[in-house]
Amino acid sequence: MSVMFDPDTAIYPFPPKPTPLSIDEKAYYREKIKRLLKERNAVMVAHYYTDPEIQQLAEETGGCISDSLEMARFGAKHPASTLLVAGVRFMGETAKILSPEKTILMPTLQAECSLDLGCPVEEFNAFCDAHPDRTVVVYANTSAAVKARADWVVTSSIAVELIDHLDSLGEKIIWAPDKHLGRYVQKQTGADILCWQGACIVHDEFKTQALTRLQEEYPDAAILVHPESPQAIVDMADAVGSTSQLIAAAKTLPHQRLIVATDRGIFYKMQQAVPDKELLEAPTAGEGATCRSCAHCPWMAMNGLQAIAEALEQEGSNHEVHVDERLRERALVPLNRMLEFAATLRG
């Protein structure tokens, strides 16, 4: 019998909320970061779920704001010798795996991910050992050690296409760690998938009753849903997709009002894409319920201006990402497979 870590019973150590900065402090750190980026030959790579002021700074300094797949592509191809990764720890690890010659800095190395935390490598290895006939596909939201055990790494933007491809080859699949995304992909492809039972603490909190009430209040609104959400939420969607796919859907849908079921950090780029449309947050708490994340990842919120300035100024172990070389080489194989497969989709 396989060992299975139970994320539902795990207690994730949420970080304290960052201390708000004054307007003057923000201006000071913004200018300091711009100067340090030039001095360090560094570029910012920020995820859609970071705070708007972080995304804006990445834009202004020639950096990248994107989903995890494009973050990986951008960082590997950019000529900068240092990458400042504003996101969570697995994103910094992925950057180091793909660009070992570069210095990878993060505002904090304590920025976790509930999907990563919910898939400890020892338990996952035991799970895989119990099913040796299955191809192991892991989501990008995993540690370097879990990636090293995988045959494939995948992001939500290409998950359906990859699993459909593997299914066409007759392969049976282990999917980890997100149970909701795994269920969505299985439903879309009909593939034989055995799912690990992890979940994103942000998307797992969306509630159908509260979303139904909001839909009744705004009957002309389209509902956009990330597939890390529970199936009942996905079933209510007019569009389902990764962060980049949801932004694209916001542009193509005719609706002038959009209810968005993903981390509210996406609103910065989505509003740029559809400046004339109204964006509404999908509710994360139902009747008598409270939210822990409240539609914003608490670890993404750790990527503040002060922490970014400190990362660029203070070289060393507090901010620099390191990955064991043997582990890196093993994790690079499924990551490269992902990038090569994604390239075939782009034509």
Swiss-Prot record:
Regions annotated as coiled coil: none
Cofactor(s) this protein cannot do without: [4Fe-4S] cluster
Pathway: Cofactor biosynthesis; NAD(+) biosynthesis; quinolinate from iminoaspartate: step 1/1
Primary enzyme class: transferase
Main localization (coarse): cytoplasm
A Gene Ontology molecular function term of the record: quinolinate synthetase A activity
Similarity-based family: Belongs to the quinolinate synthase family. Type 1 subfamily.
Name by which UniProt lists this protein: Quinolinate synthase
UniProt organism field: Escherichia coli (strain SMS-3-5 / SECEC)
Gene: nadA
